Amino acid sequence: MTIGIDKIGFATSPYVLRLEDLATARDTDPEKLSKGLLLKEQSVAPITEDIVTLAATAADDILTDEDKEAIDMVILATESGIDQSKAAAVFVHGLLDIQPFARSFEMKEACYAATAALDYAKLHVEKFPQSKVLVIASDIAKYGIGTPGEPTQGAGAVAMLISQNPRILSFNDDNVAQTRDVMDFWRPNYATTPFVNGIYSTQQYLDSLKTTWVEYQKRTGLALTDFAAVCFHLPYPKLALKGLKKILDKSVSEEKKDQLQYNFDQSILYSQRVGNIYTGSLFLGLLSLLENDPQLKAGDRIALFSYGSGAVSEIFSANLVPGFEQLLDHKRMEKLDQRTVLSVSDYERLFYEEVDLDPSGNQVFEPATHQTFALTEIKEHQRTYQKVEK
């Protein structure tokens, strides 16, 4: 039995900030962002957009009524949780009208959790071949106005439908994971933005990649030459580029290096315009590769490197399925062009906008333009979401 990704969808917020404008406002050389980070834009979420609305929008774009009847598990991976008790997946399950006899829960381990969700989904489908699992990585990355991490913010969700006989990618049984207890990035319950040790986190990312890659090669017998492309977790593309160079060795021909570099360049196109979406960043890179690389063909093996601060990393691979191109959206760049461009002052206003409840725990919200799902009300401290009528 083959198991893998049958469908994949993506959603981001309707607003975008150009990093050239941010650099000017922060009195920074724009090339520090465009060349130093390889970033161009970042999506900005209004108060009516959160991990639930992004997740529901990403999944709604790909699911049929038949899918909703077959799905018996909904996993939402995030580090932008909206509730310390109720899983965001439960809200999403309801908004999508998925059949009731399903498990719905949330997973957390920084940017890594969506990979763990895929592992769990695969095991579930192995046990129950007729079932389908909806895995969604949904996050809003916020570091703070004027902080070093401000240029690497973003918002978005990637939804993946996992099933037997998948039509996009089939997973291989070659996962290798590593855990190390480090404090490179963390956000305590009392903090609204994370604490980041940037240089240390970069070191941990690259060392986790190198050591996990060495172990992966040892266990599988595979080498870099066996892969058509490598996708990386993308907190910002320049770090992933350093990662690619880290695993290139003298045994790789110049022709192969050129191929891997070209495919890497296709994998970062969406992230350059959306920014960091934490749990979804790796899979946004995968989606960008699949939708923008005309050289890929059925049977090609793709390696994926997942990293979550704290830290857990994992390397695994998947093979492209014949006809995968038909399940993709090749007009995604045009959709990104349709976002509303914000001035820096408008971005700052949205950044600082917070829930302002009355004494009874109530507030009504007006959905932003072009939202598919929106937070419309908080009533007695209970969040209400609705599909927005077009």
Describe these PLM feature segments.
Residues 1-48, 147-203, 207, 316-390:
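Condensing-enzyme catalytic core mediating Claisen C-C bond formation in acyl metabolism
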Residues 5, 51-112, 222-247:
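Conserved beta-ketoacyl condensing-enzyme motif
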Residues 9-11, 77-82, 109-114, 137-142, ...:
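Acidic, glycine-rich active-site loops and adjacent beta-strand->loop/helix elements
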Residues 29, 51-66, 88, 204-220, ...:
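Short, well-ordered amphipathic alpha-helical segments that serve as non-catalytic structural scaffolds
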Residues 32-36, 40-50, 80-132, 249-281:
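Conserved catalytic cysteine-centered active-site region
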Residues 126-159:
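Flexible, glycine-rich active-site loops centered on histidine and acidic residues
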Residues 199-220, 224-248, 270-275:
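A conserved active-site cap/scaffold subdomain adjacent to cofactor or substrate pockets
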Residues 287-337:
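Catalytic phosphate/nucleotide-handling subdomain of diverse soluble enzymes
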